[in-house]
Curated annotation (Swiss-Prot):
Organism: Bordetella avium (strain 197N)
Lineage: Bacteria, Pseudomonadati, Pseudomonadota, Betaproteobacteria, Burkholderiales
Binding site for ATP: 130-185
Record field: catalytic activity: 2 D-alanine + ATP = D-alanyl-D-alanine + ADP + phosphate + H(+)
EC number: 6.3.2.4
Protein name, per record: D-alanine--D-alanine ligase
């Protein structure tokens, strides 16, 4: 079965702030694919030029890149030009999901629940933002993941420092209403009508601090899969996750992050189109809950690889 994939490149590393995580994800995916009999080879896009992909004879690639130049549509566009099938979402969906502000706008247009927010920049009167969104609130760069540059602001006096941390990555920053509740995530597989949600995972971090360190480098965070939720609530969250995925045009696989408030109302936070695939990562955990091994998951994602753009038909004459 795996022989039909031909020579496969596992794109990892890259140049984003999430390079370290991507190196771990790529190494895991590479090992899993090799164990399944796939002719897989690592390719660090931060060290090698993409034109080398074509020269190396890769017939498809597994994108294990995170953040800028990996899940923002840039690498996807290059692969379309090279006509090399790739995993995950296409150019447009990747770019949309990478921009948390645009993502929230799309979700609101589709009637999906997401916390109130504002765009802020260097001209914004920062101390007035809490008047509209309340305290605490969240400041985050809209084009980063893995909690990079995120600050929970507890007082007006902290706004400038929090903005400085986020604006180090993006000039325009997302200010978001803080919703107190349970942190949940839903992995998704497939595309279009075939998109499906895997069981909901609950994340319980020390003092509620699910930061970069606790995500990837400690064992103090607890995960519950499936999450201990009333059946109706779990089904509602999975349904919203699929709707959010489809609204953005996502394909292949992804992960939707939620907060569940005290009234069991789920709130969408963001969509990841190239989620982590490390030993601590959540998509492999959800797959295990439905009897899918890590290697089987990687092969299933790879099997869905494709070029998404279609060349227009040539006019006669």
């Amino acid at each position: 079965m795996t022989q039909r994939f031909g020579k496969v490149g596992v794109l990892y590393g890259g140049r984003s702030a999430e390079r370290e995580v991507s190196l771990m994800s790529g190494a895991g995916v590479h090992e899993a694919l090799r164990s399944a009999g796939v002719d897989a080879h690592l390719f660090d896009t931060g060290l090698q030029d993409l034109t080398a992909l074509e020269a190396a004879g890769f017939e498809r690639v597994f994108i294990a890149l995170h953040g800028r130049f990996g899940e923002d549509g840039a690498i996807q566009g290059a692969l379309e030009l090279l006509n090399i099938p790739y995993t995950g979402s296409g150019v447009t969906a990747s770019a949309l999901a990478m921009d948390k502000i645009m993502t929230k706008r799309v979700w609101l247009q589709h009637g999906l629940p997401t916390p109130a927010f504002e765009e802020i920049d260097s001209d914004t009167e920062l101390r007035r933002v809490p008047d509209r969104l309340g305290l605490p609130l969240i400041l985050k760069p809209p084009h980063e993941g893995s909690t990079v540059g995120i600050t929970k602001v507890a007082a007006c006096a902290d706004m400038e420092q929090a903005y400085a941390a986020a604006s180090h990555f993006d000039e325009v920053v997302l200010a978001e209403q803080f919703v107190r509740g349970r942190e949940l995530t839903v992995a998704l597989l497939g595309s279009g009508r075939n998109a499906r949600a895997l069981p909901v995972i609950e994340i319980v971090a020390p003092d509620g601090n699910y930061d970069y360190q606790n995500k990837y480098f400690t064992d103090v965070t607890q995960y519950f899969c499936p999450a201990d939720l009333p059946v109706g609530v779990a089904e509602q969250i999975e349904k919203i996750a699929v709707q959010a995925y489809r609204a953005l045009g996502c394909e292949g696989w992804g992960r939707a992050d939620f907060i569940l408030d005290g009234q069991n109302q789920p709130w969408l936070l963001e969509m990841n189109t190239s989620p982590g695939m490390t030993s601590h990562s959540l998509v492999p955990m959800a797959a295990r809950a439905v009897g899918m091994s890590y290697a089987e998951l990687c092969v299933a994602i790879l099997a869905d690889a494709s070029c998404k753009l279609r060349a227009p038909a040539r006019a006669n004459g």
